[in-house]
Design a protein with these regions (language model features):
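Aromatic-lined, polymer-binding surfaces characteristic
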Residues: 64, 75-78, 92-244, 248, ...
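Terminal, non-catalytic domain-edge segments
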Residues: 7-56, 60, 77, 81, ...
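N-terminal export leaders
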Residues: 1-2
Length: 405
């Protein structure tokens, strides 16, 4: 038998890493297989596509735009940070270089990785996430593209007007695309923006929640789409001082401010959903979107908009522990490093009829706080227990009350 001392010497002691190091390593792990392949025009060649057992029969080629668009929307803020010679900086620079080449392949009809822009309705969804990535990191991800590539994007975005979105969260996909066209100084359709804004306002049901269309559904689409995209659209329109029909800029600014306050309330609800054990409730459709659930909370962190009830160290600790718990489960990734269908691990039966493993990359939206530099207080603040952990440990924690705006 080995002595205790001898055995201890044989055990590899892993260096304890910071929360930020864990986040960046996980973001790189998710992004690298996608971008390293797509930068060479080899994503379609090498990505193992996995579709839901109840797939509706649409072209499986929608997978690649879902994968690329959702990934880039989540990591764009991180890639917008300036270069440095740290290990993180090297990863970030490599991903950005791959991403810029991938953006070009996505709209080049002669590339093997030209995405499915002109068939099916699904491209409206994931083009909106590509537009989101450009809005979130315009200087680093849009401006360096050559003029031919930029014009190709503008054309593809405009051609998506062929799709008549249903009166659900899909209206915001159209609005996101048109908002980016506004940002890019291209021809845009203000009616599509205004329609989405009007309907989002109508669909607010109270206490930080919007319905997804006329009827309320208890799911996480407030996280995946509605709240972040509504705020992004209003910010873009107001930044450009474009007046929507029958409104004033002052009215629109109030709409933006109100949407942000409601997102703060929703962020508080999401934080309270996190159990003492760092799990969160599994309900509603699209549960395979994993940590995309926390996009509003992550966006509040990135934009320095956390409400006073949520200290930065508390939110960072909560999100880190949830991330570690979920990704510690075997089966989240396949042998080539691509995400698989499932929530915690590989659970194909959870996938909805519209889901493929490209859809899973919306989990990247949790990484928005990486857009804050390592020196920011979000990353340096002392970790604190989150609300439910305080509550179930017998410690003081804030009371909770509904909002009425």
């Amino acid at each position: 038998m080995l002595s205790t001392v001898t055995y201890a010497k044989k055990v590899k002691v892993e260096k304890e890493i910071s929360d930020r190091e864990y986040w960046t390593q996980m973001a790189y792990k998710i992004a690298a297989p996608v971008l390293s392949n797509m930068s060479k025009g080899e994503l379609k060649k090498n990505m193992q596509v996995e579709i839901s057992p109840t797939w509706d029969g649409r072209s499986k080629d929608v997978t690649y735009m879902e994968c690329f668009g959702r990934l880039m929307s989540g990591i764009a803020p991180w890639l917008s940070l300036p270069d440095d010679d740290t290990e993180e900086g090297k990863m970030r620079r490599q991903l950005r270089e791959w991403a810029l080449k991938s953006y070009a392949h996505a709209v080049n009809p002669d590339s093997p990785d030209y995405l499915l822009w002109r068939n099916e309705g699904q491209p409206l969804v994931d083009a909106a996430y590509i537009a989101s990535s450009f809005l979130r990191a315009k200087k680093q991800l849009w401006e360096p593209l050559d003029e031919v590539t930029k014009q190709r994007y503008i054309k593809e975005f405009q051609l998506l007007r062929r799709i008549d979105p249903p009166y659900t969260n899909w209206l915001l996909f159209s609005a996101m695309i048109e908002s980016f066209l506004m940002e890019a100084d291209a021809q845009y359709d203000l009616f599509r923006i205004h329609t989405a804004v009007r309907k989002a306002e109508e669909w607010y049901v109270g206490d930080g929640w919007y319905s997804d269309g006329e009827t309320f559904a208890f799911d996480y689409y407030n996280s995946y789409v509605i709240q972040p995209m509504f705020v992004q659209v209003m910010q873009t329109v107001n930044d450009h001082k474009v007046i929507l029909h029958d409104r004033s800029l002052e009215m629109q600014k109030k709409t933006e401010d109100l949407a942000k306050k409601r997102m703060q309330r929703f962020g508080m609800i999401l934080e309270r959903f996190i159990s003492p054990e760092a799990s969160f409730p599994v309900f509603g459709r699209s549960m395979t979107y994993r940590l995309g659930v926390f996009q509003p909370l992550s966006m509040l962190c990135w934009k320095d908009m956390l409400p006073k009830e949520l200290p930065e160290g508390q939110v960072r600790n909560a999100l880190t522990c949830v991330m570690k718990r979920l990704f510690a489960v075997d089966g989240n990734f396949n042998e080539k490093g691509f995400l698989q269908l499932g929530f915690a691990g590989h659970q194909t039966g959870l996938a909805d009829w519209y889901s493929n493993n490209g859809s899973m990359y919306i989990t990247s939206e949790v990484f928005l706080p990486l857009g804050l530099p390592a020196s920011h207080s979000f990353w340096t603040a002392k970790p604190q227990d989150w609300t439910s952990k305080k509550a179930w440990s017998g410690h003081e924690f804030p009371k909770d009350h509904a909002i009425h705006y």
